[in-house]
Amino acid sequence: MYMVEKSGKLLCRIVLIMLLFVLCFCASCGHKEARYALDMAEKRMWDEPDSALKVLESIVMPEDLEGKELADYALLLTQAQYRSNIVATSDSLINIAVGYYQDKDVEKRTASLLYKGGVLKDMGKDEEAMLVYKEAESYIPRIKDNRIVTLIYMGLGYLNQKNRNYALSIDYFKKSVAVNIVPKQVLSWKVSSIMNLANISYYWGNRDDADLYYSQLLDMVPLVDSMLQTKIYYNYGIYKSKEKEWAEAEKYGLSCNSWGINIC
C-alpha cells in the first residue's frame, strides 16, 4: 500500500514537471513568434504600412507581451495605424513605448515621441502635441534615421501653420524638404511640404516665392503617381484662378465657372 501511494505521488510529480515543461516550451515558442512578427512588421513599415499592420494584428495575446517586446509592439502598432490613416482616440498605447525607451534607445525614443505628437495632433490637443514634437526635435542631432527627422519637421510645420505661426511653419517645411533621404520613400512628403510652402507664401503675398515653389511641384510631376499628379495640378489650378489667369487655370482642370466666378 505504501509503495503504491509512493508511486502515485511520483507519477503526479512527473506529470506536473511535464506540464511545466510544456507550458515553458509554449511560452518560449509564443515569445519567438511574437519577436519574429515584430521584426517583420518593422521591416515592412515604411513601404507597406498596411501589411505591417496585418502582421501586428496576427500576434496572439499581445497583452501578455512584456518589456522590450511590449514597447516595440506599442510603437509599431501606433506607427502602422498612423501611417494607415487610422485615427487614434487615446495616447495610452504609445505612452508605453515613450516610457520604456526614455533612457534606452534614442532612435526609438524619438520615434515614440514623433508618433505621440501625431496622435495628440489628431486628437485636437495641439498644445500638448507641440510640446511633444519639440521634445522629439531636441533628439534630432542624436539620431540617424532621416525619415523620422523629416516627419518631425513636417509635424511642427503643420502645427505652426494651423496656429498661424507662418514664419515658423515656413522654416520647418523648408527643413523637411532639405533633409537628405531616399527620394522614392519620401517624395510624397516633399510634395506636401513644398505645397504648404507655396500656399503660405501666397497667403503672405510673396508671389515670387509661391511661383518658385509651384514650379518645383510641376517639375516633380513626372516622378510621382497619378494621385499626387492630380493633387499638384489641382492646387496649381486654384493658385492660377486666384491670380485670375483663367487660361492657365483651365489648362490644369479648373474653370472660372467652377468657382462661381462670372468674370472670365
Which functions belong to the PLM regions below?
Residues Y2-E5, C26-C264:
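A "functional boundary" signal
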Residues Y2-L16:
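Bacterial N-terminal signal peptides that target proteins for export
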Residues V15-C26:
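Bacterial N-terminal signal peptides
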